[in-house]
């Protein structure tokens, strides 16, 4: 893969599989260690740039970097010169000049990660190519590491992804998670079904490698995995569905709907969950739910991504 991870669609099948395999290898390398430290990125500086609120993604990237012995520095809008009006470009160039090896960005603007990679790409000198850029979520565009950890969780639970039927349910329109999962899971050979009200499907979805349905119940009996999406009210201005109650009755994963799933099926959610709206608490806490497994896998996947963009070697340092 390239020295950046900007979109799930940029990953080949071999690239994605290598990251998933290395995520499993990192997890195994940490088993039994009293102190969870590997020397893999010793001497490297990783900077997280989060311009949107985050718990899971930010913490897992920080933990991933620290478990690999990198120096991890946090930059936020509130605590940096961004709060004084500094542009994203100037902040990026400052971090590049300061010697950052990797920039991990979450930003409300779609395409922000691509711009960051362009701005910091270096001056043509191969010894100074600029930092690697990892997209931790840009607007409604992409969230590639979330898709990777979802794929890893499905692979662990089901034994593989090829030929599996993955049903993605909810606010597809505003979901970068949905976009990245569609691209990655399709690349890995899964059959992807989108279930959403017509108002929460993006323009052009008919060109995606998916099947689209408005009938959640009809898709449950054949599902191998169900990925529930949060309704992103912060990106809406109203009018997408009549009421929370009606949305939940049509597109929420209730106990009744869980009973329609095959026994082997796995339930996923990228978080944060709106319990009682898109998913019942009893379902979220059930044995079919892999929500906490997703969080654990998030650390290992992000370790693998940092390894691939910064080192790119075949062997993980022990």
Swiss-Prot record:
<feature type="binding site">
    <location>
        <position position="272"/>
    </location>
    <ligand>
        <name>carbamoyl phosphate</name>
    </ligand>
</feature>
<dbReference type="GO" id="GO:0005829">
    <property type="term" value="C:cytosol"/>
</dbReference>
<dbReference type="GO" id="GO:0004070">
    <property type="term" value="F:aspartate carbamoyltransferase activity"/>
</dbReference>
<dbReference type="InterPro" id="IPR036901">
    <property type="entry name" value="Asp/Orn_carbamoylTrfase_sf"/>
</dbReference>
<feature type="binding site">
    <location>
        <position position="271"/>
    </location>
    <ligand>
        <name>carbamoyl phosphate</name>
    </ligand>
</feature>
<feature type="binding site">
    <location>
        <position position="56"/>
    </location>
    <ligand>
        <name>carbamoyl phosphate</name>
    </ligand>
</feature>
<dbReference type="Pfam" id="PF02729">
    <property type="entry name" value="OTCace_N"/>
</dbReference>
<dbReference type="InterPro" id="IPR006131">
    <property type="entry name" value="Asp_carbamoyltransf_Asp/Orn-bd"/>
</dbReference>
<dbReference type="InterPro" id="IPR006132">
    <property type="entry name" value="Asp/Orn_carbamoyltranf_P-bd"/>
</dbReference>
<comment type="function">
    <text>Catalyzes the condensation of carbamoyl phosphate and aspartate to form carbamoyl aspartate and inorganic phosphate, the committed step in the de novo pyrimidine nucleotide biosynthesis pathway.</text>
</comment>
<keyword id="KW-0665">Pyrimidine biosynthesis</keyword>
<feature type="binding site">
    <location>
        <position position="146"/>
    </location>
    <ligand>
        <name>carbamoyl phosphate</name>
    </ligand>
</feature>
<comment type="subunit">
    <text>Heterododecamer (2C3:3R2) of six catalytic PyrB chains organized as two trimers (C3), and six regulatory PyrI chains organized as three dimers (R2).</text>
</comment>
<protein>
    <recommendedName>
        <fullName>Aspartate carbamoyltransferase catalytic subunit</fullName>
        <ecNumber>2.1.3.2</ecNumber>
    </recommendedName>
</protein>
<feature type="binding site">
    <location>
        <position position="106"/>
    </location>
    <ligand>
        <name>carbamoyl phosphate</name>
    </ligand>
</feature>
<comment type="similarity">
    <text>Belongs to the aspartate/ornithine carbamoyltransferase superfamily. ATCase family.</text>
</comment>
<comment type="pathway">
    <text>Pyrimidine metabolism; UMP biosynthesis via de novo pathway; (S)-dihydroorotate from bicarbonate: step 2/3.</text>
</comment>
<feature type="binding site">
    <location>
        <position position="84"/>
    </location>
    <ligand>
        <name>L-aspartate</name>
    </ligand>
</feature>
<dbReference type="GO" id="GO:0006520">
    <property type="term" value="P:amino acid metabolic process"/>
</dbReference>
<keyword id="KW-0808">Transferase</keyword>
<dbReference type="GO" id="GO:0016597">
    <property type="term" value="F:amino acid binding"/>
</dbReference>
<feature type="binding site">
    <location>
        <position position="143"/>
    </location>
    <ligand>
        <name>carbamoyl phosphate</name>
    </ligand>
</feature>
<feature type="binding site">
    <location>
        <position position="176"/>
    </location>
    <ligand>
        <name>L-aspartate</name>
    </ligand>
</feature>
<dbReference type="Pfam" id="PF00185">
    <property type="entry name" value="OTCace"/>
</dbReference>
<feature type="binding site">
    <location>
        <position position="57"/>
    </location>
    <ligand>
        <name>carbamoyl phosphate</name>
    </ligand>
</feature>
<dbReference type="GO" id="GO:0044205">
    <property type="term" value="P:'de novo' UMP biosynthetic process"/>
</dbReference>
<dbReference type="GO" id="GO:0006207">
    <property type="term" value="P:'de novo' pyrimidine nucleobase biosynthetic process"/>
</dbReference>
<dbReference type="InterPro" id="IPR006130">
    <property type="entry name" value="Asp/Orn_carbamoylTrfase"/>
</dbReference>
<dbReference type="InterPro" id="IPR002082">
    <property type="entry name" value="Asp_carbamoyltransf"/>
</dbReference>
<feature type="binding site">
    <location>
        <position position="230"/>
    </location>
    <ligand>
        <name>L-aspartate</name>
    </ligand>
</feature>
